[in-house]
């Protein structure tokens, strides 16, 4: 079921993103970027990527709104798939929830929020989450970086293990004319769909999950 996005999009406008892509298109993206390393998160010399991802408490109110909407009690264990440095997850921890994070990037885990040093699990494959218990799963801006097979597996597993419907925030684009900009903005994306295509793809899970769209183009 589609709901409003609890997270605002990037501070950059669509026009700014398009201009960045035009300027950066001829530059070579290093392997470290594709492995979600330093260049992906903290290289300020790259116009794409995070360009320096530091904790500033930006997700405090977002998490508060999620807790209220989903009626999450502190007895629940909150999981985040693709938690990066844990800046969303730590806001749940600060509100006395049990938390667990799943992250592919060893760089992100090494540089995660200090309160999460022993709470983020390094995973290489989606099915590794089966080993762990959780009651509610959130997944922000990660699905496009997975294959369709991996996405379906993640959703089915989250539904099976969660006491609350899992929540997915999906980066996408509004129409076909922006597809090339979207592809070039984050080249770690492997599943490319616009809003309409995502809704169709998720139709079979519609009453069992919640999802929102983060339109970057």
State where each predicted segment sits:
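Phosphate-coordination loops involved in phosphoryl transfer and adenosine-cofactor binding
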Residues: 75
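Short catalytic micro-motifs in class I SAM-dependent methyltransferases
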Residues: 141-145
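Conserved acidic residues
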Residues: 135
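Class I (Rossmann-like) S-adenosyl-L-methionine-dependent methyltransferase catalytic domain
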Residues: 1-70, 79-130, 146-157, 164-217
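A conserved beta-strand element that flanks and buttresses the S-adenosyl-L-methionine
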Residues: 138
């Amino acid at each position: 079921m589609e709901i409003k996005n609890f997270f605002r999009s990037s501070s950059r406008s669509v026009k700014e993103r398009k201009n960045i892509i035009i300027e950066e298109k001829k530059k070579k993206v290093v392997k470290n970027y594709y492995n979600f390393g330093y260049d992906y998160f903290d290289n300020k010399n790259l116009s794409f990527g995070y360009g320096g991802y530091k904790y500033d408490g930006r997700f405090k109110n977002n998490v508060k709104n999620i807790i209220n909407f989903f009626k999450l009690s502190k007895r629940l264990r909150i999981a985040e798939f693709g938690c990066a440095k844990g800046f969303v997850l730590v806001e749940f921890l600060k509100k006395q929830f049990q938390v667990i994070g799943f992250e592919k990037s060893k760089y992100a885990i090494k540089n995660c929020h200090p309160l999460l040093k022993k709470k983020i699990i390094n995973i290489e494959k989606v099915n590794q989450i089966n080993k762990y218990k959780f009651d509610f799963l959130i997944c922000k801006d990660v699905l496009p970086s997975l294959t369709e097979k991996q996405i379906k597996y993640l959703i089915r597993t989250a539904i099976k293990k969660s006491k609350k419907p899992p929540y997915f925030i999906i980066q996408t684009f509004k129409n076909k004319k922006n597809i090339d900009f979207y592809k070039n903005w984050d080249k770690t994306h492997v599943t490319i769909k616009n809003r309409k295509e995502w809704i169709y793809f998720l139709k079979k899970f519609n009453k069992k999950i919640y999802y929102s769209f983060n339109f970057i183009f």
